[in-house]
């Protein structure tokens, strides 16, 4: 086995970094999820995750030098959604979107600021997996949420015609990119030390 192959293998430090930043990111997600008790904020959740979560995620990217780290963090998010009461759908969704984000950052050889910002735009798409049951299985989705009240349910239904899902995907990417630019501005010295330009 070559030194290059060994160098591309994830080690204990890499997994520690994944765990730390996944925990920070998850806390942000759960804090923002509380706003979902208001219908409009339920719809805006993935976009808010993109902006606010984009800041620590950009810092995480300064630690990413090997393939697999972004994908694993995305998968952790999908699994945590399932564990906290969502369906299984976010898990495969997080694998697909995490793999795309991984490829984008890898394409920049972990040194491109443009790739870092675009990756930060793509990464929060994992959270859109939470919306699929809402759009595709409304009756089942609200069956377990009757305690929210009929007015809440009616408002959410009005806000979520099927075409809105594609708007949410685009808005999430745009807001993630905004979060990337904010992270770039706030964490300039970290990127300089990591050699990302």
Question: Could you tell me what each predicted segment is?
Answer:
Residues 1-6, 12, 187-197:
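Short, charged juxtamembrane terminal tails flanking transmembrane helices
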Residues 2-68:
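Hydrophobic transmembrane alpha-helices
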Residues 15-20, 47-48, 70-75, 88-92, ...:
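Hydrophobic alpha-helical transmembrane segments
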Residues 22-30, 76-84, 122-132:
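Aromatic-anchored segments of alpha-helical transmembrane domains
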Residues 27, 94-129, 180:
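Short helix-perturbing small/polar motifs within transmembrane alpha-helices
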Residues 32, 36-40, 64, 68, ...:
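Membrane-interfacial segments
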Residues 43-103:
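Alpha-helical membrane segments and adjacent membrane-interface helices in multi-pass membrane proteins
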Residues 116-188:
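Membrane-embedded alpha-helical hairpins and interfacial helices in multi-pass inner-membrane proteins
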């Amino acid at each position: 086995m070559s030194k290059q192959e060994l160098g591309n293998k994830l080690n204990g430090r890499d997994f520690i970094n994944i765990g730390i930043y996944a925990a920070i990111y998850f806390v942000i997600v759960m804090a923002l999820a509380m706003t979902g008790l208001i219908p409009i904020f339920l719809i805006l959740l993935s976009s808010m995750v993109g902006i606010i979560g984009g800041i620590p995620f950009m810092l995480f990217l300064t630690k990413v030098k090997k393939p697999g780290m972004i994908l694993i963090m995305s998968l952790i998010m999908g699994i945590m959604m399932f564990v906290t009461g969502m369906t299984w759908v976010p898990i495969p969704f997080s694998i697909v979107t995490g793999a795309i984000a991984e490829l984008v950052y890898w394409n920049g050889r972990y040194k491109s600021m443009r790739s870092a910002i675009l990756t930060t735009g793509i990464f929060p798409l994992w959270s859109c997996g939470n919306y699929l049951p809402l759009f595709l299985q409304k009756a089942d989705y609200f069956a377990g949420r009757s305690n929210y009240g009929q007015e809440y349910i009616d408002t959410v239904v009005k806000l979520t015609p099927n075409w809105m899902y594609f708007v949410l995907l685009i808005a999430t990417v745009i807001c993630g990119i905004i979060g990337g630019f904010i992270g770039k501005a706030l964490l300039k010295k970290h990127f300089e030390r990591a050699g990302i330009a």
